[in-house]
């Protein structure tokens, strides 16, 4: 697995709706191009498994940003609370771990046994914000909500 752990995957703009442009700073996009598989199959793993509409918007916007940057996906799946059965990464080339509330995402990652599934994953892992933090072995997340301390 090749992992990119970032604070963000792009520059965010708010017009009528959120728009993301992939960052090119520090050769991020060019490094991705060097390892990108044509016809990649992507999976967006959400931070909040219950926020279906927000998850759909984030998935769609991130995958649009990749397409605009010349990094197209053949398939664009999502993993959130609508997922039925076990997580299956056998036909996935690129995983995007979304950003959001770190403890909520951490619980979801535990529920779907993401760490165990990633041990055999041989593709590209792109993590942003909370997704990057939850990729660490030991993480200190400043409490945001009552009862998190």
Q: Residue ranges of each PLM-predicted region?
A:
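Class I SAM-dependent methyltransferase SAM-binding "motif I" and its flanking Rossmann-like core
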Residues: 104-108, 114-149
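Short, surface-exposed, charge-dense and proline/glycine-enriched linear segments
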Residues: 68-76, 102-114
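Short, glycine/charged-enriched secondary-structure capping and boundary segments
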Residues: 18-20, 57-60, 109-112, 140-143
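N-terminal beta1-alpha1 cap of cysteine-dependent amidohydrolase-like domains
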Residues: 1-94
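Short, basic, glycine/proline-bearing loop/turn elements
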Residues: 94-103
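Glycine-rich nucleotide phosphate-binding loop and flanking beta-alpha elements
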Residues: 11-12, 51, 102-103, 132-134
């Amino acid at each position: 697995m090749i992992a990119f752990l970032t604070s963000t995957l792009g520059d965010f703009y708010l017009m009528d709706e959120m728009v993301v442009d992939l960052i090119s700073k520090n050769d991020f996009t060019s490094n991705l191009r060097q390892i990108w598989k044509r016809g990649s199959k992507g999976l967006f793993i959400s931070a909040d498994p219950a926020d279906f509409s927000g998850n759909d918007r984030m998935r769609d916007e991130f995958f649009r940003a990749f397409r605009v940057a010349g990094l197209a996906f053949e398939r664009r799946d999502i993993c959130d609370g609508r997922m039925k059965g076990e997580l299956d990464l056998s036909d996935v080339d690129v995983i995007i771990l979304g950003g959001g509330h770190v403890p909520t995402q951490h619980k979801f990652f535990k529920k779907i046994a993401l760490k165990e599934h990633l041990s055999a994953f041989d593709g590209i892992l792109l993590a942003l914000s909370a997704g990057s933090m939850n990729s660490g072995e030991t993480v200190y997340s400043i409490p945001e909500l009552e009862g998190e301390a």
